[in-house]
């Protein structure tokens, strides 16, 4: 990939930039933020760290929209982070106009770029970005499930004592309290999770995964998760930049999959050099479909709320 721009030089954007630059996932990396000098300073720091790691990725930062020119991929992390006691929806009224301004800049300066939305509430903002972009769903999608899956794997490893490397997990639906962890698809070394944990233990892991972001927020007091989201972004960027055809969860615009249309939901997708190559529709049992529908109904209400703003 030639040029990647991260819009939002906060902790998440910076964490992602560090990995992207270190791993040379693009030739040119831009950190863009309304606080131009902050973006410049962080970009210089990231660039110097990348050089120390043997990377040739060129990193620079600033505030001007023209910095988007020629971007192959734009990652949007800008917006206010959650504070203790806030839900992702609480920040919608603040982050929506920020996203709208960014999308206007992208349309003017990088109309062919792929757009990866990370800002919360990610389901609603991904839908908004897609709806105003004029692009197909292959070019506009969001990050949530990679992070949620990693959290679940951590909690399973903690509970069982097994290596997280041997754990597979899968999360669908909205990002937050309405997410749908598919425990039937969770395994440790190809052995179903139910072989190792009781139903009660599994439900505790599910609930902790749903509250994973809030748990970190409550403990840190002054900031939300940043390092794990940064790694999740870098994983998705790697899949796109290197055309890996990886199956990763992403917030995608559904077009009839899982019985839903015109909505952005977390589902397993194939990420390749063209962006989101396709949505994978898994067979769900009646209980799983009911949970997915409940999650979709909540996201649909959130989208309606967004449209009313």
Curated annotation (Swiss-Prot):
InterPro entries: L-lactate/malate_DH (IPR001557), Lactate/malate_DH_C (IPR022383), Lactate/malate_DH_N (IPR001236), Lactate_DH/Glyco_Ohase_4_C (IPR015955), Malate_DH_type3 (IPR011275), NAD(P)-bd_dom_sf (IPR036291). One of its GO terms (molecular function) is L-lactate dehydrogenase activity. One of its GO terms (biological process) is lactate metabolic process. The keyword Transport does not apply. The active site is at residue 175. It catalyses: (S)-malate + NAD(+) = oxaloacetate + NADH + H(+). Keywords: NAD, Oxidoreductase, Tricarboxylic acid cycle. Its EC number is 1.1.1.37. Signal peptide: none annotated. Catalyzes the reversible oxidation of malate to oxaloacetate. Belongs to the LDH/MDH superfamily. MDH type 3 family. This is Malate dehydrogenase. It comes from Pseudomonas putida (strain GB-1).
